[in-house]
Amino acid sequence: MKPAQDTRFDYVKIGLASPERVRQWGERTLPNGVVVGEVTKPETINYRTLKPEMDGLFCERIFGPSKDWECWCGKYKRVRHRGIVCERCGVEVTESRVRRHRMGYIKLAAPVTHVWYLKGIPSYMSILLDMALRDVEQIVYFNAYVVLDPGNASNLSYKQLLTEDQWIEIEDQIYAEDSDLYGIEVGIGAEAIQRLLQEMNLEEIAEILREEIAQSKGQKRAKLIKRLRVIDNFIATGSLPAWMVLDVIPVIPPDLRPMVQLDGGRFATSDLNDLYRRVINRNNRLARLQEILAPEIIVRNEKRMLQEAVDALIDNGRRGRTVVGANNRPLKSLSDIIEGKQGRFRQNLLGKRVDYSGRSVIVVGPKLKIYQCGLPREMAIELFQPFVIHRLIRLGLVNNIKAAKKLIIKGDPSVWNVLEEVITGHPVLLNRAPTLHRLGIQAFEPILVEGRAIQLHPLVCPAFNADFDGDQMAVHVPLSLESQAEARLLMLACHNILSPATGKPIVAPSQDMVLGCYYLTAENPQSQKGNGRYFGNIDDAVKAFEHGLVDLHAYVWLRSEDPNEEVVTDLPDTEVLKTETLEDGSVIKHYRERRVREIDGEAVSQFIRTTPGRIIYNKTIQDALTVA
């Protein structure tokens, strides 16, 4: 047995695999010395016995048993035969889950190019060969020959393209009796491309390119730099350009491309099985044609069909006609499974479903503090259930977990009190997809609310790029003390006032907040109710408005706490409009926006002309600053 691999690693690097590496992935030597791993038959399962066909796409000898601890022929059953390889069928007695990671391979009768490197943007194959993509395609798909060695012919050059007619003409000249031509070699298909790539000396080409770059400029220089960058990457990773042409293709584990039986006895299968079957059929047919020395034109056509089959397997529809299945639906290739929103990376690896998380619509919570969020009770009891159960048992309200769950389902009032205690000081993380920057996920202190919607402070919306037209957000509960501390110290919404990208404030009032501020402080000459009334303090003015004694925009006089307080107005307010002397000798000076009472030239009280709306606005800001 192989020693257990150390699972610790720093990073994963994706690169080109050599034919030997691909073979290693799928090849295994059985204890009896038999080497298995090559898939040679297109069959999947036997429709009578419903067992996988040997050497086929679901072969138990290559990929492992379909049933736990049971070989294909049934000679060995049960776990006591663990590790034995059946002498009759050659299947190792082990768990069936090995079929999720054991791979196979198909040895191709002729090399084929990898469609990603040929038809990708940019085309690395054409950049490396310093040829036009159209020309490389002509060679790969058997539409043109390429000169591999011009020999002593003066009218031929290395990598020159030739049509069928041109090559026949040159061939006639070579085989003529009086011909002095020799050493001419031409090729066609992926084999010719493989030969050209094998003949490349990367270090030498890189040196030549560096010299040329120093002497050139403009578009030519940019093209040379592009080619040099690709060559340098090949040198740095230790990959060979010839590996872009495939001699062996891997067959992914059968449980990742399953075949399941439906109720009516029919089978549903992964599209990959159809694509692999096409490759194997064409590969076997090509091998047979080569064996019987079939005419070149037939062999060449079969090689082209094999190239197209491998292209469809790797990336269906990238080049040529898309391969379709039943109902004219395009078959899903390996690329389709990996890429996009529903692909393996974004759907299954990055987008895993996790415990202790919930999701709901967001609504505005204007009464919340910026670092708070409203969490529906129904969601909170589910998210914090383990914590609530633990606390219920510790408080002695229940004796075991089962009783605690019953109490929670019943909705006992004591449960809500315990939940309040549990969530106090326990931050939760709110995330809105797509999380485009680090402020897309922030921590908040949960406040229990009625209803089924998460309440969010309107000021944090710009960071999440959220609005309240049906947006949804996910809630996550940090479990460990370290994650809770990190959430509180680094991720709490009140610590994320500035954008990390620009350094400018990302928390700024907008829309209805700006409208509300404007409405509170605006003027409205039609608001006359309570106009000209005097109030001794802010609270009296606010209460008068709340009881409907004055309008929000009516001008009233409010006593200032500091008689010498400077009142800021749009226009200078220094001109005394009227002076009034009282019986006690004090003087009241009437200004446009204030009234000041003075005794012996010293101000003893001051009334400011304002509106209840402006008083409320000022009071709210003062209260917020005082609390902070």
Swiss-Prot record:
Q: Which Gene3D superfamilies match?
A: 1.10.40.90, 2.40.40.20, RNA polymerase II, clamp domain, RNA polymerase Rpb1, domain 3
GO MF entry, a single one: DNA binding
Q: Give me the segments passing through the membrane.
A: none
> What GO biological process terms does the UniProt entry carry, in alphabetical order?
DNA-templated transcription
Q: What is its EC number?
A: 2.7.7.6
Per its UniProt record, the required cofactor names are: Mg(2+); Zn(2+)
Q: What are the protein's UniProt keywords?
A: DNA-directed RNA polymerase, Magnesium, Metal-binding, Nucleotidyltransferase, Transcription, Transferase, Zinc
- Where does the chain bind Mg(2+)? 467, 469, 471
Identify the InterPro entries for this entry: DNA-dir_RpoC1_gamma, DNA-dir_RpoC_beta_prime, RNA_pol_asu, RNA_pol_N, RNA_pol_Rpb1_1, RNA_pol_Rpb1_3, RNA_pol_Rpb1_3_sf, RNA_pol_Rpb1_clamp_domain
Which reaction does this chain catalyze? RNA(n) + a ribonucleoside 5'-triphosphate = RNA(n+1) + diphosphate
For this record, an example GO cellular component is: DNA-directed RNA polymerase complex
Instruction: Check the record and name the Pfam families matching this protein.
Output: RNA_pol_Rpb1_1, RNA_pol_Rpb1_2, RNA_pol_Rpb1_3
Asked whether the UniProt record includes Plastid among its keywords, one would answer: no
Q: Does the keyword Nucleotidyltransferase apply?
A: yes
Q: Where does Zn(2+) bind?
A: 71, 73, 86, 89
Enzyme category, top tier: transferase
Q: How is the cofactor bound?
A: Binds 1 Mg(2+) ion per subunit.
* Top-rank taxon: Bacteria
Q: What does this protein do?
A: DNA-dependent RNA polymerase catalyzes the transcription of DNA into RNA using the four ribonucleoside triphosphates as substrates.
Q: How does it assemble?
A: In cyanobacteria the RNAP catalytic core is composed of 2 alpha, 1 beta, 1 beta', 1 gamma and 1 omega subunit. When a sigma factor is associated with the core the holoenzyme is formed, which can initiate transcription.
Q: Which family does it belong to?
A: Belongs to the RNA polymerase beta' chain family. RpoC1 subfamily.
- What is the official name of this protein in its record? DNA-directed RNA polymerase subunit gamma
**Gene that this sequence comes from:** rpoC1
